[in-house]
């Protein structure tokens, strides 16, 4: 099986392809998650005309190195349909890539991905037979307005999708075996974020967590991929681990012991509710005693990614909670932010704090 992977020319790339079998209403999806290097995450649309050689090199590299290990980036969603066409959505870079055995199959698959409703909130209503139809619940494709045609119009009909695919295939000189790249608009994340803003506002009002923080975490964790799954089994928009944050949520917020299912956490409303509830648990329980609200927010962000234990170990060698909190309270806001972004024991968490705090300005 071949998966088409798109990267800018000259990008440093490491990735591992892992499988998760997910069967909504009897339809088998093959969901893949890839590891990309930091150099791959530059924003903006690529020069599509220069991709054929790059794609071939990347495919060759994948077959040679597919057993390499690496941390997952959950912003990739891909599946293989019943006719063996392979479709991949990169929610971070805003690219859709499709691979098929011939031109006719490629066009069918491209039209399908532009029109299908793959939102997990309604995915259980889809079967293999109706894959490719606009879902009756929303009347709009999942990628509506994130992809526009050559007229700049959102794609919601088979006619418009087919015409746009024909134009792209001609531009990219598609031949057999057939591969096609469909770009999303530059502001695709802004369009995607609007789908989930209502959930964030509802959870914010319930748990007293800023909407900007919730949205910034969603973008950082999944790039608004509602079916995101990491190698460590963190799920959905906010990358919730069922047996840790999920269990804490049900125990503390709902008052009973329960581990949420994958299906539960793939539902966007549930995921945002559980994730936001867990942020409030961090604030009110694990990080209680940090008095300055801005320092508490920074501590919440770092702990959501790296855990409170690693935060405390970063602050004091013993990892003692009270000693760590006392040190936070003794710092200025600026000193604590500098510490988190320069002295935390996990480099990933240092970068995470920088990214989330920067994104909060966009949603504030």
Residue ranges, per PLM feature:
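Catalytic and binding regions of secreted/periplasmic enzymes and modules that target cell-wall glycans
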Residues: 271-320
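Cell-wall glycan-active module
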Residues: 2-8, 12-22, 27-28, 32-219, ...
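Structural recognition of the beta-strand scaffold that forms the well-ordered cores
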Residues: 216, 237-239, 303
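Short helix/strand-bridging catalytic loops that position acidic/His residues to coordinate divalent metals
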Residues: 257-264, 289
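Substrate-binding/active-site groove segments that recognize
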Residues: 231-258, 270-281, 328-331, 356
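Amphipathic alpha-helical recognition patches that constitute DNA-binding helices
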Residues: 213, 236, 299
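Active-site metal-coordination segments of metallo-dependent hydrolases
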Residues: 188-191, 262-272
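Secretory-pathway/luminal and periplasmic proteins that interact with or process carbohydrate-rich
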Residues: 222-231, 247, 306-317
């Amino acid at each position: 099986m071949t998966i088409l992977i798109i990267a800018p020319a000259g990008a440093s790339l490491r990735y591992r392809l892992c499988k998760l079998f997910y069967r909504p209403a009897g339809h088998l999806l093959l969901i893949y998650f890839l590891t990309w290097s930091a150099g791959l995450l530059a924003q903006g649309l690529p020069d599509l005309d220069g991709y054929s050689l790059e794609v071939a090199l990347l495919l060759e590299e994948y077959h040679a190195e597919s057993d390499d290990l690496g941390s997952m980036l959950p912003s990739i969603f891909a599946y293989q349909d019943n006719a063996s066409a392979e479709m991949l959505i990169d929610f971070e870079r805003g690219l859709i890539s499709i691979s098929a055995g011939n031109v006719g199959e490629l066009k069918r698959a491209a039209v399908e991905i532009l029109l299908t409703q793959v939102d997990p909130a309604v995915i259980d209503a889809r079967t293999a037979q109706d894959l490719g139809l606009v879902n009756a619940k929303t009347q709009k494709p999942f990628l509506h307005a994130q992809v526009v045609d050559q007229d700049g119009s959102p794609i919601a009909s088979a006619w418009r999708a087919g015409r746009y695919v024909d134009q792209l295939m001609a531009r990219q000189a598609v031949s057999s075996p057939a591969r096609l790249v469909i770009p999303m608009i530059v502001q695709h994340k802004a369009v995607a974020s609007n789908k989930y803003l209502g959930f964030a506002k509802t959870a914010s009002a319930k748990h007293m967590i800023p909407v900007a923080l919730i949205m910034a975490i969603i973008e950082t964790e999944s790039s608004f991929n509602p079916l995101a799954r990491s190698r460590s089994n963190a799920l959905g928009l906010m990358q919730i681990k069922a047996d840790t944050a999920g269990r804490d949520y049900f125990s503390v917020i709902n008052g009973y012991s329960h581990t949420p299912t994958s299906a539960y956490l793939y539902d966007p409303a549930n995921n945002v509710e559980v994730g936001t509830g867990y942020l409030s648990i961090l604030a009110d329980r694990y990080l209680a005693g940090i008095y300055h609200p801005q320092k508490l927010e920074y501590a919440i962000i770092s702990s959501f990614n790296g855990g409170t234990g690693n935060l405390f170990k970063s602050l004091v060698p013993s990892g003692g909670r009270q000693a760590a909190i006392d040190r936070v309270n003794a710092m200025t806001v600026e000193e604590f932010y500098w510490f988190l972004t320069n002295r935390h024991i996990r480099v990933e968490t240092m970068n995470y704090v920088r990214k989330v705090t920067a994104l909060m300005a966009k949603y504030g």
